[in-house]
Amino acid sequence: PSVSRSAKELKAYHFLENEILHLDSDFSDFPTNVDQLAVWMQKKNKTQCLHYKEYLERRENGSAREFFGTTSKAYEFLYKVAPTKRVDGAWLYSFTQYWNDPAFRDFIQIYVEELGLGSSQSNHVKLFNKLLLSLGLHQFSMNLPDEYYHQSAIQLALAYAPSDFIPEIAGFNFGYEQLPLHLLITNYELKELGIDSKYFNLHITIDNFDNGHAQLA
């Protein structure tokens, strides 16, 4: 049976309240002053790029792959992250109801780009599913323990979160759209193993600091 939007919002509200209650934020160096965000983001981006440069130097000097020692390890990674990749960008869905408010324009732009800007072939979820299908991994995630679905459950809850959570959704988006070191290494090593890394390379391109999602966020 169809579930009403209000019922989804109520479930999302209680779920997210519980998640926030158990959130450990002590490790975060996130600035408390919004005026410091640009500097913080630039510093983080430079740090990631420096670490990636060091990684490339290690590899050029004969170091082994650091993420995927074998093809099977790469396959295992792909189907284990599938639950999260299959809801890529979902957290911004709740902002589409504010489509006529200029304050939400950049968020909605990110969302429609995640959907492929009207092209199903560019839809991020479809790209990832296509990758899994090409490798015969499309059904493996069905047997994963519940904890592998935790992150995707959070993103889907944000997708239906009521307006109370606008700051949390914006903050989640800001953090998620930063370019992480693990994405750069994953893209490099998958290509090295002959695995199509288009999905990951796409996120490196669109999440860039200068004019991509990281800047829009």
Which residues make up each language-model segment?
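Non-heme di-metal
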Residues: 1-217
